[in-house]
């Protein structure tokens, strides 16, 4: 027999530790333009005032005008997050500082 534990929330320090782990583990990004994926460095990663973790990528003047996807990679090489995107760089004069945010939310885990 197994008894399921009560809901025991993580401490604020534990949540901060998870955020720091996320900030350390992202190595680079890729963007999709047409059928091609192009590697791009991470511009910066930080914790926002509201507690979300933000990963920033800079699409400068060398990036194509239409960006249709973005992927983030873990420092160990595996795909960490990614999906479709719809960025039109023509709308911006110099480039785009793209921000991907993560919000860590606790729940009991019971269905």
Predicted stretch roles:
Residues 1-69, 75-111:
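Small cysteine-rich, disulfide-bonded extracellular modules of the LU/uPAR three-finger superfamily
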């Amino acid at each position: 027999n197994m008894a399921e534990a009560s809901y025991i929330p993580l401490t604020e320090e534990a949540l901060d530790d998870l955020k720091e782990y996320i900030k350390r583990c992202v190595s680079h990004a890729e963007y999709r333009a047409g059928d091609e994926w192009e590697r791009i460095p991470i511009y910066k990663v930080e914790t926002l005032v509201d507690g979300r973790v933000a990963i920033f990528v800079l699409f400068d003047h060398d990036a194509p005008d239409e960006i249709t996807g973005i992927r983030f990679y873990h420092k160990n090489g595996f795909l960490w997050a990614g999906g479709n995107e719809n960025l039109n760089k023509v709308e911006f004069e110099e480039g785009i500082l793209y921000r991907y945010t993560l919000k860590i939310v606790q729940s009991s885990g019971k269905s």
